[in-house]
């Protein structure tokens, strides 16, 4: 899958997801940090299968679009914690989910 990580998620997620065989980018690595939500969505929506974010407003806004989103926007609800623990919790959830 083609995965994009929002700027509010740790960069430490990139390598573990790539290790699983996914193509992974982050908003930071694409130098799109700070872009308003609407523009960010238009820039990346068609290039990715999944977009992970902790931004509730962004996820809610996409869910109200009249047209179906070409990218699955996944609101990440893992509580804030040190990066290593966050990455471990995220990856445990990711590998136990059927993304088909």
Sequence positions of predicted segments:
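Polar low-complexity intrinsically disordered regions
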Residues: 18, 46, 92-100
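Residues at secondary-structure transition points
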Residues: 31-39, 56, 81, 85
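Acidic, metal-binding active-site segment of PIN/NYN-like and related structure-specific nucleases
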Residues: 37, 44-64
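Short, basic, glycine/proline-bearing loop/turn elements
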Residues: 20-30
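Metal-dependent nucleic-acid phosphoesterase active-site entry motif
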Residues: 1-13, 94
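Mid-chain, well-packed structural core segment of small domains
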Residues: 59-94
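Hydrophobic/aromatic beta-strand patches that form the interior of the parallel beta-sheet core
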Residues: 25, 52, 74-76
């Amino acid at each position: 899958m083609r995965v994009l990580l929002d700027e509010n998620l740790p960069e430490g997620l990139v390598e573990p997801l790539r290790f699983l065989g996914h193509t992974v980018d982050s908003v930071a690595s694409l130098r799109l940090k700070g872009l308003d939500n609407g523009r960010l969505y238009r820039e990346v929506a068609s290039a990715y299968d999944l977009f992970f974010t902790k931004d509730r407003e962004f996820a809610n806004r996409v869910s109200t679009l009249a047209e179906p989103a070409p990218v699955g926007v996944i609101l990440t609800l893992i509580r804030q914690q040190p990066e290593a623990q966050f990455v471990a919790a995220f990856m445990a959830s990711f590998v136990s989910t059927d993304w088909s």
